[in-house]
């Protein structure tokens, strides 16, 4: 493993969470996108060398809404940067 690429946080309301995190970090997200294949909307914040991804489920059936229904809002995943995903 080279480093943590980003930490993904599942949220119920991306717009509200963007406002909260922008207030905490003193900056707006540098990227927002809809990932149709997963049924989610995301925002990314750069915090020093680290990235935080906020994810909200937008489709009827999606992994983020299922996660929140079971566990509530919070850390959903940690993504690592590697040289070779099949070797690590």
Q: What kind of region is each of these model predictions?
A:
Residues 1-2, 9-51, 88:
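Core segments of cupin and vicinal oxygen chelate
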Residues 11-19, 59, 70-88:
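Vicinal oxygen chelate
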Residues 30-31, 61-66:
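A short, acidic/glycine-rich surface segment
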